[in-house]
Amino acid sequence: MNQLFGSDKLRLPQRAQAGIAFVRYLIARMNHDRINVNAGYLAYITLLSIVPMLTVLLSILSKFSVFENVGSVLQSFIINNFVPASGDAVHAALQEFIANTGKMTAVGAAFLFVAALMLISNIDKNLNYIWRVKKKRRAVFSFSMYWMVLTLGPILVGASIAATSYITSLRLLDSEAISTVYDQLLRWLPFILSSSAFVGLYLLVPNKKVQFSHAVVGAMIAAVLFELSKKGFAAYITQFPSYQLIYGALAAIPILFVWVYLCWLIVLIGAEVTAALGEREHWRPTEDVIQSLPNNDTELEKDTQRDRFDSES
Protein backbone atom coordinates (compact mmCIF):
# COMPACT_ATOMS: atom_id res chain seq x y z
CA MET A 1 0.00 0.00 0.00
CA ASN A 2 2.81 2.38 0.90
CA GLN A 3 4.61 1.44 -2.30
CA LEU A 4 1.50 2.19 -4.34
CA PHE A 5 0.99 5.52 -2.57
CA GLY A 6 4.64 6.38 -3.08
CA SER A 7 4.52 5.53 -6.79
CA ASP A 8 1.48 7.79 -7.19
CA LYS A 9 3.36 10.64 -5.55
CA LEU A 10 6.23 10.11 -7.98
CA ARG A 11 3.88 9.99 -10.94
CA LEU A 12 2.20 13.31 -10.20
CA PRO A 13 5.30 15.48 -10.72
CA GLN A 14 6.02 13.64 -13.96
CA ARG A 15 2.50 14.36 -15.20
CA ALA A 16 2.84 17.98 -14.14
CA GLN A 17 6.15 18.24 -15.96
CA ALA A 18 4.60 16.69 -19.06
CA GLY A 19 1.72 19.17 -18.88
CA ILE A 20 4.07 22.13 -18.51
CA ALA A 21 6.23 20.85 -21.37
CA PHE A 22 3.12 20.46 -23.55
CA VAL A 23 1.89 23.99 -22.79
CA ARG A 24 5.32 25.45 -23.55
CA TYR A 25 5.55 23.51 -26.79
CA LEU A 26 1.99 24.52 -27.72
CA ILE A 27 2.69 28.23 -27.13
CA ALA A 28 5.94 28.03 -29.10
CA ARG A 29 4.13 26.19 -31.88
CA MET A 30 1.34 28.77 -32.08
CA ASN A 31 3.83 31.65 -32.13
CA HIS A 32 5.85 29.90 -34.80
CA ASP A 33 2.76 29.31 -36.96
CA ARG A 34 1.56 32.92 -36.44
CA ILE A 35 -2.02 31.83 -35.94
CA ASN A 36 -3.06 35.42 -35.20
CA VAL A 37 -1.94 36.43 -38.71
CA ASN A 38 -3.55 33.38 -40.31
CA ALA A 39 -6.80 34.04 -38.42
CA GLY A 40 -6.87 37.57 -39.83
CA TYR A 41 -6.28 36.23 -43.32
CA LEU A 42 -9.07 33.67 -42.96
CA ALA A 43 -11.38 36.35 -41.53
CA TYR A 44 -10.72 38.51 -44.59
CA ILE A 45 -11.42 35.62 -46.95
CA THR A 46 -14.53 34.69 -44.95
CA LEU A 47 -15.98 38.20 -45.20
CA LEU A 48 -15.45 38.05 -48.96
CA SER A 49 -17.02 34.60 -49.16
CA ILE A 50 -19.73 34.56 -46.47
CA VAL A 51 -22.45 35.95 -48.73
CA PRO A 52 -21.50 33.61 -51.63
CA MET A 53 -21.49 30.66 -49.22
CA LEU A 54 -24.94 31.52 -47.83
CA THR A 55 -26.23 32.20 -51.33
CA VAL A 56 -25.02 28.85 -52.65
CA LEU A 57 -26.38 27.07 -49.56
CA LEU A 58 -29.82 28.71 -49.73
CA SER A 59 -30.08 28.33 -53.50
CA ILE A 60 -29.42 24.58 -53.22
CA LEU A 61 -32.01 24.27 -50.45
CA SER A 62 -34.55 26.18 -52.53
CA LYS A 63 -34.38 23.48 -55.22
CA PHE A 64 -36.12 21.03 -52.88
CA SER A 65 -39.73 21.66 -51.90
CA VAL A 66 -39.29 19.78 -48.62
CA PHE A 67 -36.79 22.47 -47.53
CA GLU A 68 -39.12 25.35 -48.40
CA ASN A 69 -38.92 27.12 -45.02
CA VAL A 70 -35.54 25.80 -43.94
CA GLY A 71 -33.58 28.80 -45.26
CA SER A 72 -35.14 31.35 -42.93
CA VAL A 73 -34.96 28.93 -39.98
CA LEU A 74 -31.28 28.29 -40.68
CA GLN A 75 -30.43 32.00 -40.85
CA SER A 76 -32.27 32.70 -37.60
CA PHE A 77 -30.59 29.77 -35.85
CA ILE A 78 -27.09 30.87 -36.93
CA ILE A 79 -27.66 34.51 -35.96
CA ASN A 80 -29.25 33.71 -32.59
CA ASN A 81 -26.76 31.05 -31.49
CA PHE A 82 -23.46 31.85 -33.17
CA VAL A 83 -23.37 35.67 -33.50
CA PRO A 84 -23.18 37.37 -30.09
CA ALA A 85 -25.35 40.48 -29.67
CA SER A 86 -26.02 42.87 -32.58
CA GLY A 87 -27.51 39.86 -34.34
CA ASP A 88 -30.35 41.95 -35.76
CA ALA A 89 -27.96 44.36 -37.48
CA VAL A 90 -25.83 41.55 -38.92
CA HIS A 91 -28.94 39.61 -39.95
CA ALA A 92 -30.40 42.64 -41.74
CA ALA A 93 -27.12 43.29 -43.56
CA LEU A 94 -26.81 39.67 -44.69
CA GLN A 95 -30.44 39.60 -45.78
CA GLU A 96 -29.89 42.70 -47.91
CA PHE A 97 -26.73 41.28 -49.48
CA ILE A 98 -28.36 37.94 -50.25
CA ALA A 99 -31.45 39.63 -51.71
CA ASN A 100 -29.25 41.63 -54.08
CA THR A 101 -27.55 38.48 -55.35
CA GLY A 102 -30.84 37.40 -56.90
CA LYS A 103 -30.35 40.09 -59.53
CA MET A 104 -26.99 38.72 -60.64
CA THR A 105 -26.27 37.15 -64.01
CA ALA A 106 -24.85 33.69 -64.66
CA VAL A 107 -21.33 35.12 -64.66
CA GLY A 108 -21.94 36.68 -61.26
CA ALA A 109 -23.34 33.40 -59.94
CA ALA A 110 -20.24 31.59 -61.17
CA PHE A 111 -18.09 34.14 -59.34
CA LEU A 112 -20.05 33.48 -56.12
CA PHE A 113 -19.41 29.76 -56.48
CA VAL A 114 -15.68 30.33 -57.07
CA ALA A 115 -15.52 32.61 -54.00
CA ALA A 116 -17.17 29.90 -51.90
CA LEU A 117 -14.67 27.34 -53.19
CA MET A 118 -11.84 29.75 -52.38
CA LEU A 119 -12.88 29.88 -48.73
CA ILE A 120 -12.96 26.09 -48.39
CA SER A 121 -9.62 25.81 -50.19
CA ASN A 122 -7.92 28.29 -47.85
CA ILE A 123 -9.29 26.51 -44.78
CA ASP A 124 -7.82 23.28 -46.16
CA LYS A 125 -4.40 24.87 -46.79
CA ASN A 126 -4.15 26.52 -43.37
CA LEU A 127 -5.09 23.40 -41.42
CA ASN A 128 -2.73 21.22 -43.44
CA TYR A 129 0.04 23.72 -42.72
CA ILE A 130 -0.62 23.36 -38.97
CA TRP A 131 -0.29 19.57 -39.29
CA ARG A 132 2.94 19.95 -41.31
CA VAL A 133 1.43 18.13 -44.27
CA LYS A 134 3.90 18.36 -47.12
CA LYS A 135 2.14 16.08 -49.57
CA LYS A 136 -0.83 17.86 -51.12
CA ARG A 137 -3.99 16.19 -52.30
CA ARG A 138 -4.45 15.76 -56.02
CA ALA A 139 -6.33 18.63 -57.65
CA VAL A 140 -9.15 16.35 -58.84
CA PHE A 141 -9.64 14.90 -55.36
CA SER A 142 -9.56 18.34 -53.72
CA PHE A 143 -12.09 19.78 -56.17
CA SER A 144 -14.36 16.76 -55.68
CA MET A 145 -14.20 17.20 -51.90
CA TYR A 146 -14.94 20.94 -52.09
CA TRP A 147 -17.81 20.29 -54.51
CA MET A 148 -19.27 17.67 -52.17
CA VAL A 149 -19.12 20.11 -49.25
CA LEU A 150 -20.95 22.79 -51.23
CA THR A 151 -23.63 20.45 -52.61
CA LEU A 152 -24.22 17.74 -50.01
CA GLY A 153 -23.56 20.02 -47.03
CA PRO A 154 -26.67 22.19 -47.51
CA ILE A 155 -28.82 19.10 -48.09
CA LEU A 156 -27.64 17.48 -44.85
CA VAL A 157 -28.17 20.73 -42.93
CA GLY A 158 -31.64 21.14 -44.39
CA ALA A 159 -32.55 17.53 -43.62
CA SER A 160 -31.47 17.88 -39.98
CA ILE A 161 -33.46 21.11 -39.54
CA ALA A 162 -36.53 19.59 -41.20
CA ALA A 163 -36.29 16.52 -38.94
CA THR A 164 -35.95 18.74 -35.87
CA SER A 165 -39.01 20.76 -36.90
CA TYR A 166 -41.00 17.55 -37.39
CA ILE A 167 -40.02 16.19 -33.96
CA THR A 168 -40.92 19.53 -32.37
CA SER A 169 -44.41 19.37 -33.87
CA LEU A 170 -45.13 15.94 -32.37
CA ARG A 171 -47.45 15.67 -29.38
CA LEU A 172 -44.80 13.76 -27.48
CA LEU A 173 -43.41 17.13 -26.40
CA ASP A 174 -46.65 17.88 -24.53
CA SER A 175 -45.32 15.72 -21.71
CA GLU A 176 -43.63 17.88 -19.06
CA ALA A 177 -40.69 15.49 -18.58
CA ILE A 178 -39.96 15.19 -22.29
CA SER A 179 -40.42 18.93 -22.74
CA THR A 180 -37.84 19.63 -20.01
CA VAL A 181 -35.32 17.28 -21.64
CA TYR A 182 -35.99 18.89 -25.00
CA ASP A 183 -35.43 22.39 -23.58
CA GLN A 184 -32.13 21.28 -22.04
CA LEU A 185 -31.11 19.73 -25.35
CA LEU A 186 -31.87 22.97 -27.18
CA ARG A 187 -29.79 24.88 -24.64
CA TRP A 188 -26.80 22.62 -25.23
CA LEU A 189 -27.37 22.26 -28.97
CA PRO A 190 -25.00 25.09 -30.05
CA PHE A 191 -22.18 23.60 -27.95
CA ILE A 192 -22.87 20.10 -29.28
CA LEU A 193 -22.97 21.32 -32.87
CA SER A 194 -19.79 23.37 -32.57
CA SER A 195 -17.95 20.48 -30.86
CA SER A 196 -19.08 18.04 -33.56
CA ALA A 197 -18.08 20.48 -36.30
CA PHE A 198 -14.62 20.96 -34.78
CA VAL A 199 -14.11 17.19 -34.44
CA GLY A 200 -15.05 16.68 -38.09
CA LEU A 201 -12.84 19.57 -39.16
CA TYR A 202 -9.78 18.29 -37.31
CA LEU A 203 -10.30 14.69 -38.43
CA LEU A 204 -11.21 15.11 -42.09
CA VAL A 205 -9.40 18.19 -43.38
CA PRO A 206 -5.74 17.34 -42.62
CA ASN A 207 -4.23 15.08 -45.26
CA LYS A 208 -2.85 12.72 -42.61
CA LYS A 209 -4.21 10.40 -39.93
CA VAL A 210 -5.35 12.24 -36.81
CA GLN A 211 -6.10 10.30 -33.63
CA PHE A 212 -9.76 10.59 -32.67
CA SER A 213 -9.08 11.28 -28.99
CA HIS A 214 -6.73 14.14 -29.91
CA ALA A 215 -9.38 15.63 -32.20
CA VAL A 216 -11.98 15.38 -29.42
CA VAL A 217 -9.71 17.17 -26.92
CA GLY A 218 -8.91 19.94 -29.40
CA ALA A 219 -12.57 20.25 -30.38
CA MET A 220 -13.74 20.47 -26.76
CA ILE A 221 -11.18 23.19 -25.99
CA ALA A 222 -12.21 25.10 -29.11
CA ALA A 223 -15.92 24.73 -28.29
CA VAL A 224 -15.43 25.97 -24.71
CA LEU A 225 -13.36 28.93 -25.95
CA PHE A 226 -16.06 29.63 -28.53
CA GLU A 227 -18.83 29.74 -25.93
CA LEU A 228 -16.74 31.88 -23.55
CA SER A 229 -15.77 34.31 -26.31
CA LYS A 230 -19.40 34.51 -27.40
CA LYS A 231 -20.49 35.58 -23.93
CA GLY A 232 -17.51 37.90 -23.43
CA PHE A 233 -17.90 39.54 -26.82
CA ALA A 234 -21.64 40.02 -26.27
CA ALA A 235 -20.97 41.57 -22.85
CA TYR A 236 -18.42 43.96 -24.33
CA ILE A 237 -20.77 45.04 -27.12
CA THR A 238 -23.69 45.66 -24.77
CA GLN A 239 -21.73 47.28 -21.93
CA PHE A 240 -19.26 49.34 -23.97
CA PRO A 241 -21.12 50.41 -27.14
CA SER A 242 -18.53 53.04 -28.10
CA TYR A 243 -18.22 51.48 -31.56
CA GLN A 244 -21.72 52.78 -32.40
CA LEU A 245 -20.64 56.35 -31.69
CA ILE A 246 -17.69 55.96 -34.03
CA TYR A 247 -19.16 53.92 -36.90
CA GLY A 248 -22.86 54.76 -36.61
CA ALA A 249 -24.92 52.84 -39.15
CA LEU A 250 -21.82 50.94 -40.32
CA ALA A 251 -21.18 49.47 -36.85
CA ALA A 252 -22.24 45.98 -37.98
CA ILE A 253 -19.22 45.73 -40.31
CA PRO A 254 -16.40 45.98 -37.71
CA ILE A 255 -18.47 43.90 -35.27
CA LEU A 256 -18.77 41.12 -37.83
CA PHE A 257 -15.08 41.32 -38.77
CA VAL A 258 -13.84 41.14 -35.16
CA TRP A 259 -16.18 38.26 -34.37
CA VAL A 260 -15.14 36.29 -37.46
CA TYR A 261 -11.49 36.91 -36.54
CA LEU A 262 -12.07 35.55 -33.01
CA CYS A 263 -13.85 32.51 -34.43
CA TRP A 264 -10.95 31.64 -36.72
CA LEU A 265 -8.43 32.24 -33.95
CA ILE A 266 -10.31 29.71 -31.81
CA VAL A 267 -10.48 27.21 -34.68
CA LEU A 268 -6.72 27.47 -35.20
CA ILE A 269 -6.02 27.17 -31.45
CA GLY A 270 -8.03 23.93 -31.36
CA ALA A 271 -6.14 22.69 -34.42
CA GLU A 272 -2.80 23.51 -32.77
CA VAL A 273 -3.83 21.62 -29.62
CA THR A 274 -4.89 18.60 -31.68
CA ALA A 275 -1.69 18.60 -33.73
CA ALA A 276 0.55 19.14 -30.67
CA LEU A 277 -1.06 16.21 -28.84
CA GLY A 278 0.17 13.96 -31.64
CA GLU A 279 3.76 15.22 -31.32
CA ARG A 280 4.58 13.99 -27.83
CA GLU A 281 8.19 13.38 -28.78
CA HIS A 282 8.66 17.16 -29.11
CA TRP A 283 7.42 18.00 -25.59
CA ARG A 284 10.81 18.94 -24.23
CA PRO A 285 11.10 21.11 -21.11
CA THR A 286 14.03 23.02 -22.60
CA GLU A 287 14.46 26.74 -23.13
CA ASP A 288 14.56 26.47 -26.88
CA VAL A 289 11.38 24.48 -27.46
CA ILE A 290 10.98 25.88 -30.94
CA GLN A 291 13.92 23.75 -32.12
CA SER A 292 11.77 20.67 -31.66
CA LEU A 293 9.43 21.80 -34.40
CA PRO A 294 9.68 19.88 -37.71
CA ASN A 295 12.33 20.99 -40.18
CA ASN A 296 10.03 21.38 -43.17
CA ASP A 297 8.32 24.53 -41.82
CA THR A 298 10.26 26.91 -44.08
CA GLU A 299 9.21 25.06 -47.22
CA LEU A 300 5.63 24.80 -46.01
CA GLU A 301 5.58 28.52 -45.21
CA LYS A 302 6.85 29.36 -48.70
CA ASP A 303 4.23 27.08 -50.27
CA THR A 304 1.47 28.65 -48.17
CA GLN A 305 2.55 32.19 -49.06
CA ARG A 306 2.74 31.23 -52.73
CA ASP A 307 -0.76 29.70 -52.60
CA ARG A 308 -2.11 32.82 -50.89
CA PHE A 309 -0.57 35.06 -53.54
CA ASP A 310 -2.10 32.94 -56.30
CA SER A 311 -5.55 32.96 -54.67
CA GLU A 312 -5.50 36.73 -54.09
CA SER A 313 -4.28 37.52 -57.60
UniProtKB/Swiss-Prot annotation:
Belongs to the UPF0761 family. This is UPF0761 membrane protein VV0203. Residues 299-313 have a biased composition (Basic and acidic residues). The chain crosses the membrane at residues 41-61, 104-124, 139-159, 185-205, 215-235, 249-269. HAMAP family: UPF0761. The lineage of its organism: Bacteria, Pseudomonadati, Pseudomonadota, Gammaproteobacteria, Vibrionales. One of its GO terms (cellular component) is plasma membrane. Keywords: Cell inner membrane, Cell membrane, Membrane, Transmembrane, Transmembrane helix. It is a multi-pass membrane protein. Residues 293-313 are annotated as: Disordered. Coiled coil: none annotated. It is found in: Cell inner membrane. Pfam families: Virul_fac_BrkB.
